[in-house]
């Protein structure tokens, strides 16, 4: 039988059955009743998982060595596994209010190990979560002395700290219009007792802005007891804004433009304060330090801020050498440094004010000082009496003459 290309399918009847001659004979595979294929194994399922999830699964085990040196592993407790999961997703937690403090301390440490407070994406929310629930336990005292770069980089995170009792911002160059003023004068820092604002380029306008919420709305810094305003451009006019601090007990005005005159004495008499004869130890910054759960977080921020690469000053020095001004600039810088050192050496006498009760209840050193003064007075009077001329002394009596003749 001849089959052409133009012809279609040809069917032939054989043994009473009709079949197609031109079509390719295909055999359908028999149906399989298996649930899994022959090459399916549990190991293949593990290999298909992402590497990150496998690394997290290893955290659920504790690997140890026994005395024989063989490796053994044990499964962590359900509490530890749950704590790790919450720490990995702490930024998605709604609230920790009512959560036990002991568990919160462990959760804070676990989140710190995972870098939740160092990442800019999660640091602000994570700190806010803990500060709203535990307040001063997270951070009670914050020392940012001369850390102006840290303030500019971590301003949003610093704003989350509530219930601070001591804040040291000495030498941070804030000026009169810094964004941190809103945080200092907010209700979040109504519990602040000590505030160090020395060497911040503050003027009377900055002091007015700092005290505005207390003077107008009676909010913010209402419990302030110690204030450091040393080395700022503050005059007698700016001191009138301090009358709103009813609980103020100690004030430092060293290195300012305040002149002691009769009007200033009247102002401090109205404040119930007097000039301290000896420098107060509260303004030495020795007792101020960072305290709380977030102490290591602040240190880690400072370390990461210090790791930022510095700009190469080589193009600048090359330009100075090309124009022949390197020597001139160096001389100017040296002269400025010498003048600054001279000003630091020739600092004014510490001007510390305190409440009259505190001044009256002086330390034992003050008592010894007063006794020393009284002794000096006695010695001076005796010396004056001995140095007096003979003519001004009383004449000898008859009994005195007889007594002298008996010798």
Curated annotation (Swiss-Prot):
Region (Disordered): 360-389
Keyword Repeat attributed: yes
Alphabetical list of InterPro entries matching this protein: Leu-rich_rpt, LRR_dom_sf, LRRC42
Keyword Transcription regulation assigned: no
Signal peptide: none
Stored PROSITE patterns: LRR
Keyword terms of this UniProt record: Leucine-rich repeat, Repeat
Stretches forming LRR repeats: 138-159, 163-184, 191-211, 223-243, 247-268
Protein family per UniProt: Belongs to the LRRC42 family.
Protein name as catalogued: Leucine-rich repeat-containing protein 42
């Amino acid at each position: 039988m001849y089959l052409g290309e133009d012809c279609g399918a040809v069917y032939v009847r054989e043994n009473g059955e009709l079949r197609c001659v031109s079509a390719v004979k295909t055999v359908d595979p028999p149906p399989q009743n298996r649930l899994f294929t022959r090459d399916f194994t549990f190991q293949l399922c593990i290999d298909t998982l992402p590497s990150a999830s496998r690394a997290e699964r290893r955290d659920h085990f504790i690997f140890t060595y026994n005395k024989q040196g063989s490796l053994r592993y044990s499964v962590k407790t359900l509490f530890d596994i749950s704590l790790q999961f919450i720490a990995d997703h702490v930024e998605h937690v709604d609230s920790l209010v009512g959560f036990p403090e002991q568990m919160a301390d462990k959760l804070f440490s676990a989140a710190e190990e995972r870098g939740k407070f160092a990442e800019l994406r999660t640091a602000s929310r994570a700190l806010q979560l803990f500060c709203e629930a535990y307040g001063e336990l997270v951070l009670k005292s914050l020392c940012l002395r001369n850390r102006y770069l840290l303030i500019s980089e971590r301003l949003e995170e610093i704003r989350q700290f509530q219930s601070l009792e001591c804040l040291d911002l000495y030498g941070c160059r804030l000026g009169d219009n810094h964004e941190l003023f809103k945080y200092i004068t907010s209700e979040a820092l109504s519990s602040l007792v000590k505030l160090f604002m020395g060497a911040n380029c503050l003027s009377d306008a900055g002091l007015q802005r700092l005290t505005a919420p207390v003077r107008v709305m009676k909010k913010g810094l209402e419990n302030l007891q110690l204030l450091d305003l040393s080395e700022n451009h503050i005059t007698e006019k700016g001191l009138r804004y301090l009358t709103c601090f009813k609980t103020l007990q100690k004030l430092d005005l060293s290195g300012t433009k305040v002149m002691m005159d009769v009007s200033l004495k009247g102002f401090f008499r109205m404040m119930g304060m007097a000039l301290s004869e000896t420098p107060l130890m509260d303004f030495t910054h020795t007792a101020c330090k960072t305290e709380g759960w977030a102490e290591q977080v602040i240190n880690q921020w400072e370390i990461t801020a210090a790791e930022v690469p510095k700009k190469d000053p080589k193009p600048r020095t090359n330009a100075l050498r090309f124009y022949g001004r390197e020597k001139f600039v160096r001389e100017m810088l040296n002269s400025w440094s010498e003048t600054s050192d001279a000003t630091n050496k020739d600092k004014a006498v510490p001007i510390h004010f305190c409440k009259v009760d505190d001044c009256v209840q002086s330390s034992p050193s003050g008592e010894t000082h007063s006794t020393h003064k009284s002794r000096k007075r006695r010695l001076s009077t005796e010396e004056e009496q001995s140095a007096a001329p003979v003519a001004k002394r009383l004449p000898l009596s008859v009994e005195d003459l007889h007594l002298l003749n008996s010798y």
